[in-house]
Amino acid sequence: MKIKINRIVEGAKIKLPARAHYNDAGADVYTTYGETLKPHETRRIPLGFSLELPDGVMACVFPRSGMSLEGLVCELPPIDSDYTGEVHAIVTNLTDKLKKVPGGTRIGQLVVIPIVLPDFVEQLGEERGDSAFMSTGEA
């Protein structure tokens, strides 16, 4: 699958998402500018690009294990296919210290995920029980 990426600032030296290995689930994403997060602060960190996701997929910026060990974690709000703005990493500093994140830091991993688009209905037109374990009789 090919997904179009648009640089937010043309000609800027923005690092675009890149996989370290061909079969990695996520592509590393990088901070555009240096950031300093206060203790327990959550902030949107711009990544310098937007995506043109096809229908039927979403994306999330997952935490990197190395950043998590330092007390910086990415939250996981979905990036829907109709969102065309700049992609951000939503990062929380879980520590009691200021955390500096230099520009160009690998802050997370962009993962594209296929989704099911259900129709939510009140009735399916079939009888279903609300019992669970041993609901069909003795073993």
Question: Can you name each region flagged by the protein language model?
Answer:
Residues 1-139:
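DUTPase catalytic domain/fold
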